[in-house]
């Protein structure tokens, strides 16, 4: 009765809310959000540097999140590379001195805070020719003015960056008098034109005063109150912003440190100076402001201009625009023709007359419609991760942000369970379910930033290995049973795997290896195909006649294992193979194939394990050793219970080992050999009991059917900055943002899956002669792409 009510309820929901209506809703949401963000950009401005300098919040205790953009954490080498041959000057009081020390420590962490505090402090890194000076001018007075005035002279070398600020010393010396504030205003008014002149050739920042923690202030600092600090800040902002009459001031207000201090000043030792962690954050913001536009780090979107549109991207935009126009013309013509041939009613009989000609939906219409949809989807991809229309934020890991969503989807998955059509081991519904829940876990892992937590990282590595295990199992089973080594099958698989990634490489201007999982699966598919297709071709039908062929196949697999071991322990040979042109165009990332070597080596044995498992399973199945009936255990009760016990112990043992990992490099070294233990344990736990084999989660299986699209699409329309950050469609409400962006993301992935299937039927025909012609066209397309890519690379250099 409950099952009947569940099915009726599901039909009722599907009647009113289908996948199609969900996609329409997603499209409306995208248009509304794009319009809102465009309006916001026009009203507030498009300069993310202003947001970085003036706004933000803490994610947790020490992670600062600027409004609308991402901050990069600069390493020593990156900082030196950015600041080579540069001169940075800090002018001000003890607070500016603190900022100076924190900034210098990004370049040289060993630099010590020592020497006379009330004197100038020089720093120079000769390896990068970086010069950073602190100039002691605790008051805005004639002394500071003279220092700045010297730099305005044409004959004097000017600092590339000037960071200035002072006020608390004036409040302290003059006991917080109103006369001191008036004098401060006069002095800063006289300095403002000089700063403005310097700002035309250098980056000039005026650091507003941070609040103090009044309860901790010593007696000789009690007159420094937050009320007086606010008055001095207001004076500085008012005067510096009005120093130019007809245009915006070039002197940038560094006010974000105030926000940081408001959250952390309670941790101050004296109530006046910020704790070290806060100073490090402020210094890193300063580094981002100056260096992001120079080095253009992927995860540092603040202060970065929109990347220039390449020639290939322009051609892609033209192609999709023509496809949209072509489809609209085709649709209008087809619609008019349909109206002309509309069934009319016989006046005498009242019956409808049938049309003589019934126009079928042509391949051309499907082709144009698919490219039209794809063009609109690619426009959304570009808006999300290249056009800087939508906001981006840094990830921040907490245990709750990972484990709570995992529990939530687990409950949903258990709720939506149905009976399988067949009860074989790893049947289609079960493998779709497996792919589905693994993909959802991987998505949660990525968006929560859980890679920083090693036990979670190691378990996710097993899930990636399980995908590759399924690749080995699935393709081996197909070739072994069907014996179909035709070019049509190969082209269909390669097209479905690579179509979306090739389009994204063109539209998003990213190398093929950037979407590392697709190259990995593609190469392993070709390895499986070549292994089984090479002479002698051994398939199940042939092996059934003579057991000798089983040994022949095992010999083939043995040679494959030796070849894998050879490449795994010969990095030079591996790099020589994949550095050959044009393979290098596919597998190089940042000018070398190391990343590809690392990714391939990390799961080098698991595809072989999948093939071997498929061979053993199909051999046992053929000899009717397995009981795969509905509700029946896979083996006899004793053997089933024993194997279940071993599987559970093995599964838990691996989890305990992964959870106790302390060093990522060491665990990665062991992973290729031991990951199969947990994979096989899971398969046996899932398939030995008959009742477990007879049901599956339709919720997980639905996601499993679009798992590849979900994995690829997340790079740009769910995450941001090439997976380094999170896409923000709705700022200020993280939960609502995740719900809306996830809804749109899933709808897009599902639509792309359908588009890929439709195009695969048209572009990859079954007729061999037609297919060869199409392959020649595809080869010509890629040759053209290689030529254009080479032209682009030369123009960049």
Curated annotation (Swiss-Prot):
Q: Can you name a GO cellular component term?
A: Golgi membrane
- Supply the EC number(s): 2.3.1.45
Mapped to this chain, the residue ranges on the Cytoplasmic side of the membrane are 1-18, 335-363, 417-439, 483-486, 535-547, 627-638, 693-698, 747-770
Q: What is the effect of changing residue 94 to A?
A: Abolishes O-acetyltransferase activity
Q: Which InterPro entries match?
A: Cas1_AcylTrans_dom, Cyclin-like_sf, NXPE4_C
Main location per UniProt?
Answer: Golgi
Question: What's a single GO MF annotation on this record?
Answer: N-acetylneuraminate 9-O-acetyltransferase activity
Listed A to Z, the keywords are: Acyltransferase, Glycoprotein, Golgi apparatus, Membrane, Transferase, Transmembrane, Transmembrane helix
Q: In which tissues is it expressed?
A: Highly expressed in peripheral B lymphocytes.
Q: How is it modified after translation?
A: N-glycosylated.
Q: Where in the cell is it found?
A: Golgi apparatus membrane
The record's catalysed reaction(s) read: CMP-N-acetyl-beta-neuraminate + acetyl-CoA = CMP-N-acetyl-9-O-acetyl-beta-neuraminate + CoA; a ganglioside GD3 (d18:1(4E)) + acetyl-CoA = a ganglioside Ac-O-7-GD3(d18:1(4E)) + CoA; CMP-N-acetyl-beta-neuraminate + acetyl-CoA = CMP-N-acetyl-7-O-acetyl-beta-neuraminate + CoA
Q: What does the entry give for GO biological process?
A: carbohydrate metabolic process
Q: What Pfam families has UniProt attached to this entry?
A: Cas1_AcylT, NXPE4_C
- Active-site feature positions: 94, 270, 273
- Transmembrane stretches, by residue range? 19-39, 314-334, 364-384, 396-416, 440-460, 462-482, 487-507, 514-534, 548-568, 606-626, 639-659, 672-692, 699-719, 726-746, 771-791
Q: Report the sequence similarity comment from the record.
A: Belongs to the PC-esterase family. CASD1 subfamily.
Record function comment: Key enzyme in the biosynthesis of O-acetylated (O-Ac) sialoglycans such as gangliosides O-AcGD3 and O-AcGD2, which affect various processes such as cell-cell interactions, host-pathogen recognition. Catalyzes the transfer of an acetyl group from a donor, the acetyl-coenzyme-A molecule (acetyl-CoA), to the C7/8/9 OH-position of a sialic acid residue.
Q: What is this protein called?
A: N-acetylneuraminate (7)9-O-acetyltransferase
Source organism phylogeny: Eukaryota, Metazoa, Chordata, Craniata, Vertebrata
């Amino acid at each position: 009765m409950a099952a009947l009510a569940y099915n009726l309820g599901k039909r009722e929901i599907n009647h009113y809310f289908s996948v199609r209506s969900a996609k329409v809703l997603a499209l409306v949401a995208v248009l509304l959000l794009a319009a809102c963000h465009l309006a916001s950009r026009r009203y507030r401005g498009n300069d993310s540097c202003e947001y970085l300098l003036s706004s933000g919040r803490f994610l947790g205790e020490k992670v600062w999140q600027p409004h609308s953009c991402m901050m990069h954490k600069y390493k020593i080498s990156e900082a030196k590379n950015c600041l080579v041959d540069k001169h940075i000057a800090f002018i001000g009081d003890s607070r500016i001195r603190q900022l100076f020390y924190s900034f210098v420590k990004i370049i040289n962490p060993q630099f010590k805070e020592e020497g006379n505090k009330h004197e100038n402090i020089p720093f120079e890194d000769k390896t990068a020719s970086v010069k950073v000076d602190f100039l002691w001018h605790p008051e805005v007075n004639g002394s500071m003015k003279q220092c700045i005035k010297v730099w305005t002279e044409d004959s004097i070398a000017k600092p590339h960056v000037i960071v200035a600020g002072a006020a608390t010393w004036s409040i302290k010396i003059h006991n917080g008098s109103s006369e001191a504030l008036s004098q401060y205003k006069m002095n800063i008014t006289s300095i403002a034109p000089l700063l403005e002149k310097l700002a035309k050739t250098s980056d000039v920042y005026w650091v507003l005063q941070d609040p103090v923690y009044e309860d901790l202030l010593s007696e000789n600092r009690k007159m420094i109150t937050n009320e007086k600090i606010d008055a001095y800040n207001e004076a500085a902002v008012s005067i510096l912003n009005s120093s130019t009459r007809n245009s915006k001031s070039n002197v940038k207000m560094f006010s974000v440190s105030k926000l940081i201090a408001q959250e952390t000043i309670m941790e101050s030792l004296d109530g006046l100076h910020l704790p070290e962690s806060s100073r490090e954050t402020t210094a890193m913001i300063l580094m981002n402001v100056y260096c992001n536009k120079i080095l253009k780090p992927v995860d540092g979107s603040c202060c970065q201009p929109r990347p220039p549109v390449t020639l290939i991207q322009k051609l892609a935009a033209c192609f999709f625009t023509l496809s949209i126009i072509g489809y609209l013309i085709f649709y209008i013509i087809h619609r008019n023709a349909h109206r002309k041939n509309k069934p009319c009613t016989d006046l005498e009989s009242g019956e409808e007359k049938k049309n003589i000609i019934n126009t079928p939906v042509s391949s051309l219409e499907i082709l144009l419609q698919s490219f039209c949809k794809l063009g609109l989807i690619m426009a959304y991809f570009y808006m999300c991760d290249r056009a800087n229309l939508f906001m981006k934020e840094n990830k921040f890991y907490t245990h709750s942000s990972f484990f709570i969503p995992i529990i939530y989807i687990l409950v949903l998955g258990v709720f939506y369970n149905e009976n399988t059509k067949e009860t074989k081991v790893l049947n289609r519904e079960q493998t779709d379910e497996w792919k589905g829940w693994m993909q959802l876990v991987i998505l949660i892992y990525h968006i929560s930033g859980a890679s920083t937590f090693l036990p979670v990282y190691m378990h996710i590595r097993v899930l990636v290995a399980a995908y590759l295990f399924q690749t080995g199992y699935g393709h081996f089973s197909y070739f072994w049973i069907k014996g179909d080594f035709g070019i049509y099958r190969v082209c269909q698989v390669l097209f479905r795997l690579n179509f979306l990634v090739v389009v994204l490489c063109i539209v998003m201007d990213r190398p093929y290896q950037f979407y590392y999982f697709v190259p990995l699966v593609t190469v392993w598919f070709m390895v499986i195909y070549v292994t089984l297709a090479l002479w002698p071709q051994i398939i199940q039908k042939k092996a059934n006649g003579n057991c000798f062929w089983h040994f022949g196949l095992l010999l083939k697999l043995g040679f494959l294992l030796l070849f894998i071991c050879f490449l795994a322990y010969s990095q030079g040979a591996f790099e020589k193979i994949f550095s050959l042109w044009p393979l290098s165009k596919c597998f190089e990332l940042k000018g070398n194939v190391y990343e590809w070597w690392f990714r391939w080596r990390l799961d080098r044995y698991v595809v072989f394990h999948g093939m071997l498992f498929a061979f053993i399973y199909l051999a046992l199945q053929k000899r009717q050793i397995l009981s795969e009936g509905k509700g029946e255990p896979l083996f006899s009760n004793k053997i089933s219970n024993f194997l279940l016990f071993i599987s559970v112990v093995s599964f838990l043992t691996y989890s305990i080992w992964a959870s106790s990992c302390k060093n990522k490099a060491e665990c990665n070294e062991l992973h290729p050999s031991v990951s199969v233990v947990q994979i096989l344990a899971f398969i046996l736990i899932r398939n030995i009991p008959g009742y477990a084999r007879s049901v599956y989660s339709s919720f997980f299986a639905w996601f499993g059917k679009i798992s590849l699209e979900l994995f690829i699409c997340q790079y740009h329309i769910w995450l941001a900055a090439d997976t380094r950050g999170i896409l923000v469609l709705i700022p200020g409400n993280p939960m609502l943002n995740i719900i809306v962006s996830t809804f749109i993301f899933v709808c897009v992935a599902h639509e792309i899956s359908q588009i890929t299937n439709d195009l695969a039927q048209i572009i990859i025909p079954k007729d061999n002669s037609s297919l060869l012609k199409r392959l020649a066209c595809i080869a010509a397309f890629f040759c053209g792409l290689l030529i254009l890519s080479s032209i682009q690379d030369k123009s960049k250099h």
